[in-house]
UniProtKB/Swiss-Prot annotation:
Organism expressing this protein natively: Haemophilus influenzae
UniProt entry keywords in alphabetical sequence: ATP-binding, Capsule biogenesis/degradation, Cell inner membrane, Cell membrane, Membrane, Nucleotide-binding, Polysaccharide transport, Sugar transport, Transport
Protein name: ATP-binding protein BexA
UniProt-annotated binding residues for ATP: 38-45
Its membrane topology: Peripheral membrane protein
PROSITE patterns membership: ABC_TRANSPORTER_1 (PS00211), ABC_TRANSPORTER_2 (PS50893)
Iron among keywords: no
GO biological process: polysaccharide transport
InterPro entries listed in its UniProt record: AAA+_ATPase, ABC_transporter-like_ATP-bd, ABC_transporter-like_CS, ABC_transpr_TagH-like, Bact_Polysacc_Export_ATP-bd, P-loop_NTPase
Location within or outside the cell: Cell inner membrane
Role summary: Putative ATP-binding protein, and an energy-coupling component of capsule polysaccharide export apparatus.
Claim: Membrane is one of the keywords in the record: yes
GO cellular component labels: plasma membrane
């Protein structure tokens, strides 16, 4: 289970402190799939970073009794001067996973070929996303964090990503952040809406859609 308790997040800006998340509360059970709807700037990606442990909350707590992925396709943690393979080996040490398996999986899944032996700073954004997604799926987690539905490379590769995540790992928990209600309907059991840093809960997904659509007017 993941429990988010009264979480707030503030950032210091040139004009003073900006509150991005305000008293966020929710729980995610094993196998549950929740969507987080919100327009750009609503705090969705910030919440994902907090849940993954990339950043701490300003106040409140996040309790984790199951393993949580880093945000899928997030390449910000890569060391640009290192090769794709060097970054892969670092992930293996960090998560104590078999480097031979991760190497085989990443080579086959990412389809990056010899670019795996080039510095990541030479990669295009799409290549970085392919590497990040392959590494994310090479390590098994109880809960996967997805910041926007798979938009990596061409449609064939995107479909391969969706199959690996939503079919082969359909027993896992998922938190899917998006501004696309259709994506939520395809992959989630229920949804919440983030609006100006405040989380709104609903009895079912249709009511969440309705509220979200009203906020877009």
């Amino acid at each position: 289970m993941i429990r988010v308790n009264n979480v707030c997040k503030k950032y210091h800006t040139n004009s003073g402190w900006k509150t991005v998340l305000k008293n966020i509360n929710f729980e995610l059970q094993k196998g549950e799939k929740i969507g987080i709807l919100g327009r750009n700037g609503a705090g969705k990606s910030t919440l994902i970073r907090l849940m993954s442990g990339v950043e701490p909350p300003t106040s409140g707590t996040i309790e984790r009794s199951m393993s949580i992925s880093w945000p899928l396709a997030f390449s910000g943690a890569f060391q640009g001067s290192l090769t794709g393979m060097d970054n892969l080996r670092f992930i293996c040490r960090l998560y104590d996973v078999d480097p031979d398996y991760v190497t085989r999986f990443t080579k086959e899944f990412s389809e990056l070929g010899d670019y795996l032996y080039e510095p990541v700073k030479k990669y295009s954004s799409g290549m970085k996303a392919r590497l990040a997604f392959a590494l994310s799926l090479s390590v098994e987690f109880d809960c996967y964090l997805i910041d926007e539905v798979i938009a990596v490379g061409d449609s064939r590769f995107a479909e391969k990503c969706k199959y690996e995540l939503f079919e082969k790992r359909k027993d896992r928990s998922i938190i899917l952040v998006s501004h696309s209600p259709s994506a939520m309907k395809s992959y989630c059991d229920n949804a919440v809406v983030l609006e100006n840093g405040i989380m709104h809960h609903f009895e079912d997904m249709d009511k969440a859609y309705q509220y979200y659509n009203e906020t877009q007017k």
